[in-house]
Amino acid sequence: VFALAQKSSGADTATICYAVDADFAMEQNVSAFSFSDMTLKNIGIKKALPDTEEQALVFLFMASSQVTPEKYEELLDDFIAEYPNSADGYVRRATNRIYRSKDDASMDKVVADMDKALSVAQKKDDVYYNRAKLIYNYMLGNPEKPYKDWSYDKAVDEIRKAIAVQELPVYVQTEGDILFAKQDYAAALACYEKVNQSDIASAATFFSAAKTKELMKAPAEEVLALMDSCVVRFTEPYTEEAAPYLLERAQARMNANQARAAMLDYDAYYKAVNGKVNDVFYYYREQAALKAKQFQRALNDMEKAIELSPKDLTYRAELAVVNIRVGRNEEALKVLQDALAIDSKYAEAYRLMGIAQLQMKKKQEACQSFAKAKELGDPNVDGLIEKHCK
C-alpha cells in the first residue's frame, strides 16, 4: 500500500483522483498537546500516551484540568504501567487520590504510592519534599481525625529529610510554611530570613517574613521594613500583582504611625486595581486620612463607603465622628438621624448625638441622648453621663 485513493465528486471526476500517501498515516502520533486536539476528542477513541516520558508528563498536566478525577486516575494508571520507574507517576496519583480519600483504606493507597515513589526515585529529596507538601496541605484542611501519624510535625520531618539531601531554598520556604502553620513563628522566621537571602527571594517571601514578625509582636518598624522590601520588588506604575502588598504595607505604615505614607499606599492600590474597590477600602483609607488630619478626604471616603453599603451603620457613625471632629455638628446630627431611621435601637448613634449636642452647648438634649444610649446598652456612655449629667 502506498496510498489510499478516494473517488472525486463533481465536475472533475473524469480527470482527477485524490489520494493520501501512506507515509502520512505513519507520521501520525500523540503529542503532549493531543489531549486538547478537538479532532481527536470528537473521535471518542481513548488516546495513547505520547512516546516519551517527558511528553507524557506534559500530557498528564494538560489532562488534569480537563477530566474528572476518576478519568485522570485512569490516565495515571496508564502512565505508571508505561513508566513504572518514574517517581512522578506515583506522586501525581497520590496527590489525586488524597483529594478523593474518604477513609483510612484510601489513605493507605496514598501512602503506598509515596513509598513506591521514594523507592524508584533518582532524586529522593524531591519525593520527601512532595510528601511534606502532601501532609502539610492535608493538615491545612483541618481533618477531624488526622490519618494515623500525619501531623505538622511529620511534615516538618519529611521536609528536613529533603533539606538533608539538598538544601534548596524552595525546601527551606516549605519548612517555614509548615512551621508557621504549627505556630512556631520564631523557627518559621529563621527559615524565611534564609530564603530572603537566596535567589528565590520575592515579594511573597518577604511578605511571609513580615506577617511572621507581626504575629511575634515585633516592633512595627521591623514589620514595615520587611514590607518595604516586599513592595520594592515591583515597579511603578503598579499592577494588580502588587496591589495586595500595597494594601498590607498601608496597614503596616498605620501601625508605625505613618498615616500620610499609608494614604499614599492606599492611593497607589486604588490606581493598581483601576478603582475597583469596595466599601471596606474606603473605610480603611478614611482611617488613614483621619489620622493624618486630612479631614476633607476622610469625609469624602466615608460618604463613598456609605454609598456602596448604605445599611452599614458603622460607616454612618464614623462619618458622624469626622463631622464632630471638624465642628460640623449639625451635619453629624443629620447623619446620625439617618442611621436611626435604619435602626432605631442603634445605641452608638445616641451617644454620638449627645457628644455633638454638647459641642453645640445643648447640655439638656445631650444628657437625654446619653440616657437613651445607656437604655439601649451602650457600654461607653457611663463616663459621659458621670462627667456632664450629674
Where are these regions (language model features)?
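C-terminal cap/linker of serine protease catalytic domains
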Residues: 2-63
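Canonical tetratricopeptide repeat
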Residues: 92, 130, 174, 208, ...
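Residue-level recognition of tetratricopeptide repeat
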Residues: 86, 124, 168-169, 202, ...
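Structural marker of alpha-solenoid helical repeat scaffolds
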Residues: 82, 120, 164-165, 198, ...
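TPR alpha-solenoid repeat register
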Residues: 89, 127, 171-172, 205, ...
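Register position in tetratricopeptide repeats
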Residues: 99, 137-138, 181, 215-216, ...
